[in-house]
Amino acid sequence: MKRAIVACRGTADRVVLKEREVYHGAHSCRIYATMGHLSSGCTDGCIGYGDCMAACPYGAITLNKNQVAVVDPAVCIGCGLCTTICPRHLISLQEKSDVAEVSFVLCHNTLTGKRAKDACANTCIGCKRCVKVCPQHCIEVIDNVAHIDVSRCVGCKVCMGVCPEGAIYPLAWVDPAERRRRMDRVAVR
């Protein structure tokens, strides 16, 4: 069983939101990204026009108050349509783990240190603290962003405790009965 995860949290003070206020083009993530709109903020985060939301035939994706895509794990069936539509490749399908709750990095920002923090308040700064403390050795930093192999994560959450930016979150799986209950509600809409 798979489900989609968006590797971005964004913030209410995101530079992208401010820049979108002066953008007068089509309200599409793909068009916004294709135009090469220059950003002084995170150029790897969710653009927030909801192309993924429109692509999801199950209504599993919404935009939160920060205009960042969020997937409802109880409604997502793991079809993968959203993964192909995101121009910044923020959405991935994650396989269900044997562990009830694993750790996941909700960031895709490739900037480091201060530059990363200036771009977004919820960023991974690539400090590698999580790599050093992981007892399962399932974390690596690639392009200045920590990546956790959820198939090897045991859910100890040691990495969450040492992350100075709070970029690592628990990824819980919804039980099949709850998924069916929520899917029934979606079908009624």
What would you call each of these model-derived segments?
Residues 1-69, 73-75, 80-133, 162, ...:
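Ferredoxin-type iron-sulfur electron-transfer modules and their immediate structural context
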Residues 129, 135-147:
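Strongly charged, low-complexity linkers/loops
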